Amino acid sequence: MSFLTLKDVDLKDKKVLVRVDFNVPVKDGKVTSKVRIEAAIPTIQYILDQGGAVILMSHLGRPTEGEYDSQFSLEPVAKALSEIINKPVKFAKDWLDGVDVKAGEIVMCENVRFNSGEKKSTDDLSKKIASLGDVFVMDAFATAHRAQASTYGVAKYIPVACAGILLTNEIQALEKALKSPKKPMAAIVGGSKVSTKLSVLNNLLDKVEILIVGGGIANTFIKAEGFDVGNSLYEQDLVAEATEILAKAKALGVNIPVPVDVRVAKEFSENAQAIIKKVSDVVADEMILDIGPESQKIIAELLKSANTILWNGPVGVFEFDNFAEGTKALSLAIAQSHAFSVAGGGDTIAAIEKFGIKDQVSYISTAGGAFLEFLEGKKLPAIEILKEKAIR
């Protein structure tokens, strides 16, 4: 890799600053999902095993920067980590003036966003954070697209900066899927808006043989094919863009299977009755909330031929059971595939959990925004600074 990884660095008797992604749901002072905490354990354990001292940093939620707010405190997260790793985890509420930690110990610092200058990565704050440790480990891929003090600035000023085990695994999986994929390659891009995924769609066109669109994005493509989408969520101002993408795909020999049938309802409701219709039969007062059985079959058949699958976003309103069939069929097709599969994004992970296919997906990314920016082909600031440090 073009940057140092944790295993390239001497950690014995070093104070190791680790930027983790512990932005987890907390309710009544208890962590309700520990997935992101568990994902950081290999990095933490490796540092301890190598004789280092661990200083953990993370954000939680969106507090007003520079102000303490107990509802965004990481104290419950420190307790949850202690239970998972079966070791004491000290909690440092005020930590910028120094952290008392010895080899073999773990300290969790309070929310980085309580510090003024975090989001703008001010030199003053970045230098203060860097002065706390000997080595900086970036292990929060979910925040790698942000040039903030705890993800980017600290790496500029600390003597050694490297990637943690989780970050290294994320980059390797994504590069395997995007930079050296085993062909044919299929990508699934779902979700409500074309506008947020337009550059992703354009970037993927040059890399894939199959591009499956779902959700509100698919509705915009259905409209681009000249069909009425009734009361469905779609973006009128991006119909021309969708038409261009379809034309470009045709020229490149990329298959975009725009839905041929859909499940519609008269209202956006969990209890709404799902009616299966051809796309040509959707009327003005109906909204498309899922793909239909014919479209499911087409997608499942296409995915059988793929050797690499990249998945970001559902193909319907899978949170409502009446409109979950399309995303369920997609999930099962990916689960049954022999392909190397990478999935990412909050809704995608929720679908994976709902349909119980976690063990059948080759790699599940913990990131949302950073995952998308990687798919767009953008450079991620927190990764770029690690590359720069490796050259120096």
From Swiss-Prot:
Keywords attached to this Swiss-Prot or TrEMBL record, sorted alphabetically, are: ATP-binding, Cytoplasm, Glycolysis, Kinase, Nucleotide-binding, Transferase
Q: Which residues bind ATP?
A: 197, 319, 345-348
Q: Which InterPro entries match?
A: Phosphoglycerate_kinase (IPR001576), Phosphoglycerate_kinase_CS (IPR015911), Phosphoglycerate_kinase_N (IPR015824), Phosphoglycerate_kinase_sf (IPR036043)
Pfam families, alphabetized: PGK
Enzyme class (EC, first level): transferase
Q: Which pathway is it part of? A: Carbohydrate degradation; glycolysis; pyruvate from D-glyceraldehyde 3-phosphate: step 2/5
Coiled-coil annotation: which residues? none
What this protein catalyses is: (2R)-3-phosphoglycerate + ATP = (2R)-3-phospho-glyceroyl phosphate + ADP
GO cellular component terms, alphabetically, are: cytosol
Q: What is this protein called?
A: Phosphoglycerate kinase
Query: What subcellular locations does the record give?
Result: Cytoplasm
Q: Which family does it belong to?
A: Belongs to the phosphoglycerate kinase family.
List this protein's GO terms for biological process.
gluconeogenesis; glycolytic process
Primary localization class, coarse: cytoplasm
Q: Where does substrate bind?
A: 21-23, 36, 59-62, 113, 146
